[in-house]
């Protein structure tokens, strides 16, 4: 398991007072879902507001792709998600965006200085949050 990705995500985008708990949960298999659940509905409690570039339900795939191209790591990155088939996998931005759009649960894509988080889908489109550590 690549815990460097989790540590990078936590240190860049989580508020300082919540980092230790989130990292503990992400690293412990029996608690991993607890950590991901925190981003389903009340992500604003955990994310560093200063790093949020954009959030909403109407963010297009094109916008997501453009921000990854501008601030990401050569169009590749890592997923952190509920679906174990993709969790901690390296993949292209296109593949990650497809997973973010089509999976009903929370998913995070980290690429370079950008992170895209999709919340749990309840009704209508999912909420998408774009974070950037150098914006």
Region roles according to the model:
Residues 1-124, 132-135:
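Structured alpha/beta or helical-core interaction and ligand-binding surfaces enriched in interleaved
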């Amino acid at each position: 398991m690549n815990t460097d990705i989790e540590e990078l995500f936590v240190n860049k985008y989580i508020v300082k007072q919540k980092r230790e708990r989130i990292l503990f949960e992400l690293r412990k298999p029996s608690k991993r879902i607890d950590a991901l659940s925190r981003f389903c509905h009340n992500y604003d409690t955990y994310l560093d507001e200063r790093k949020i570039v954009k959030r909403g339900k109407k963010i297009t795939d094109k916008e997501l792709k453009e921000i990854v191209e501008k601030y990401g790591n050569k169009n590749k990155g890592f997923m952190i998600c509920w679906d174990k088939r993709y969790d901690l996998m390296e993949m292209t931005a296109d593949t990650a965006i497809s997973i973010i759009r089509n999976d009903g649960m929370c998913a995070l894509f980290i690429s370079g200085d950008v992170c895209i988080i999709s919340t749990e889908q309840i009704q209508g489109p999912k909420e998408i949050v774009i974070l950037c550590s150098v914006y």
